Amino acid sequence: MAARALCMLGLVLALLSSSSAEEYVGLSANQCAVPAKDRVDCGYPHVTPKECNNRGCCFDSRIPGVPWCFKPLQEAECTF
């Protein structure tokens, strides 16, 4: 029974973490398609996706060691 509960908890945590990996509220995915090496930090340590988006920035935590909250591309810079 305890093993099943641990499996369920792991599944829930995995789903929650994957759903917040990239957030583009109010921005297009193209605006947030900034290569990791070109990201300009827009947040602060431990910024949440919601706080980042409220600043008008993109949030993507999939790549360690680079800013997760970063300035979006302007529409003219977007690569379609």
UniProtKB/Swiss-Prot annotation:
Residues 30-73 form the P-type domain. Involved in the maintenance and repair of the intestinal mucosa. Promotes the mobility of epithelial cells in healing processes (motogen). Residues 1-21 form the signal peptide. PANTHER family: INTESTINAL TREFOIL FACTOR-RELATED, TREFOIL FACTOR 3. Disulfide bonds join 32-58, 42-57, 52-69. GO terms for cellular component: extracellular region; extracellular space; secretory granule. It comes from Homo sapiens (Human). The gene is TFF3. This is Trefoil factor 3.
